[in-house]
Structure formats: C-alpha cells, structure tokens
Amino acid sequence: KHMKYFLLTALVSLAFLTSCRTLQNIQKPSAGAAHQSQEQQYKAAVVAKAQTAQCVTAKINMDVDADGKQISCGGSLKMKRDDVIQLSLTFLGFEVGRLEFTPKDVLVVDRIHKQYSRASYGEVDFLRQADLDFYTLQSLFWNEIFTPGSRDVRSQLNRFRLAASGDHTSLLLTDAPKLNYQFLTRTSSALLDRVTVDGKSTADQGQFVWKYDNFTTLSGKPFPALMEVSINGMGKKAGFTLA
C-alpha cells in the first residue's frame, strides 16, 4: 500500500531529469504566414516546440516529499511516443518499484512486497480527479500543451485564450467542463514553463502544477532537464524531484 501511494506520488512532483546533452541557444518563434493574426502565430510557435524524437531514456535521482516524509532513490525514465511512459525506481542498485503508463491502463509494481496493481485511468482517484489520461500525461512528460480528450492540439488552438504578464504569456483553456488549464510560456522563446490545473468549483480546492526548467536539447529541440510536479488539495499534498 505504501509503495503504491509512493509511486503515484511520484507523478505528483517531478524534478531533475538528467541529460548528457549540452544546452543550445533557443531561437525566438519565427513569423508565421502573413494572414495569421499575432495570437495565432504565437500559438503555432508554442506547438512547433513539440518534440520530433520518438523515444527518451534518462537516468534519474528522485527526492520525494509526501505529507512531510522525505524519500530519496534513483531510477530511470523511459518513454516511447504513443506507446509507454515507464518510471523505474531503484535503491542500492535494485529496482524497488515501477510505474508504467500505456494508452490502456496504469501498472504499479512493488518489488519489495512482491505485489502489483493494474488499473484503468478512471480507477485511479488522482488521475480521474485531474482528468489525466495517457495522452495528457504524455504531453506533460514531453513538455507540450494539450487539450483534454483530444490527441490533435493543433486543431484545438482556437480554444486557447492568450494573456500576457511580464516575460510570460499564458495559454488559457477555460471551456473544459470541470477544470481550468493554464499553460505558462516564455514569451521570448514560446517554451512551456508551467502547467497549472485548477477546479472550476469554489468547493474544489485541488491544484495540480507541473513546472519545467534547465532546458537542454533533444533531437535539436529544447527539452527540460528539470521537471517539478506538485499536487495539493484533494485530501493530499505531495511533491518530488527527479534528477
């Protein structure tokens, strides 16, 4: 039970995704077609940052803060586009747990107690409450904007409203039934800095935040070497760091 909660908590606050690649200068978004409005051009520039790489493998060091309890371990993150997201946790060189997402379901493996659990996304409370399915999680791990329930964000760009604030521009998605989505980007580069998901109801105090930083390159495109994820409300508060 504790390992299952720990692994699900690992979703809740990711940071430090190490990479051996070097940092490169990030280009400002290019001007779009002449007929596009400035807002359309900016939205297109954000989407254009999406990765062309189909696979990512990285070693990680994870520091987890769950309800005031600090846990540290190593591991690896493996992703294959539209196929799998796998987070393996190790201690003293041995795998102690695994969290695996596929388009169909979620697998949690507890090596210590020799237990595993496989469930649909609707059966995992945290994922259901945050309206997260495989393709939404994939976008979060790959540092991409998304629209819940759709795999083609390009066809949904008219749903986003832009709001500028200092050095950042937010893409706001407020027409979803129960949740509001804010995608905070760096105006100078159109890079996604943070995703915030809030409930629409005043009675729903839950908030899910996924932050990105320390951008490196992956197949010639910027990719965050630092991810930090946190969740509060919904009866729990937790966070963790991947490095």
Residues of each region from the PLM?
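Sec-dependent bacterial lipoprotein signal peptides
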Residues: 1-20
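N-terminal leader/targeting segments and the immediate start of mature chains
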Residues: 20-71
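Edge/loop elements at the starts and ends of beta-strands within beta-rich repeat scaffolds
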Residues: 48-56, 68-71, 78, 82, ...
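Beta-strand-dominated lipid-handling architectures at cellular/organellar boundaries
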Residues: 59, 70-78, 191, 209
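Hydrophobic lipid-interacting interfaces of membrane-associated proteins
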Residues: 63-65, 92-94, 109, 113, ...
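An acidic-aromatic
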Residues: 84-135
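C-terminal low-complexity, charged extensions that often adopt amphipathic alpha-helices
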Residues: 122, 127-160
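Gly/Pro-enriched, hydrophobic low-complexity segments
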Residues: 152-243
